[in-house]
């Protein structure tokens, strides 16, 4: 009888764990979402310190079409700011230069007619 009772207790514990598992998944997803939002706010705060309003506006507009490029640039700017390598604020002109340096060079193809 003890074995049967032990099996029942084990099965009951498994069922209770399965029922609480969706709650744990939802809670973990919520925590990840909160952590991501906090990181985004920290990045925005750093960018406010190192960029002029015009440059931030350009970056915001560019995010709509080139999200990966903007995220890469933001991470580099945050890293430079944290290391103290930015002496002046990034203005719109400096941002344009940085963006052109980050974009891969396109091949020029020319068609010649014979």
Swiss-Prot record:
Signal peptide: none annotated. It comes from the Archaea. Residues 16-35 have a biased composition (Low complexity). GO terms for cellular component: cytosol. Disulfide bonds: none annotated. Residues 14-37 are annotated as: Disordered. Keywords: DNA-binding. NCBIfam families: PRK04239.1. This is DNA-binding protein Mbur_0117.
């Amino acid at each position: 009888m003890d074995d049967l009772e032990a099996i029942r207790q084990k099965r009951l514990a498994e069922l209770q764990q399965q029922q609480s598992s969706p709650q744990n998944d939802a809670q973990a997803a919520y925590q990840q979402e909160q952590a991501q939002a906090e990181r985004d706010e920290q990045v925005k705060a750093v960018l406010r310190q190192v960029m002029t309003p015009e440059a931030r506006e350009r970056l915001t507009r560019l995010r709509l079409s080139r999200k990966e490029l903007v995220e890469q640039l933001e991470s580099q700017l945050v890293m430079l700011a944290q290391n103290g390598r930015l002496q002046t604020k990034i203005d719109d002109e400096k941002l344009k230069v940085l963006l052109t340096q980050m974009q891969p060079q396109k091949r020029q193809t020319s068609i010649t007619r014979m």
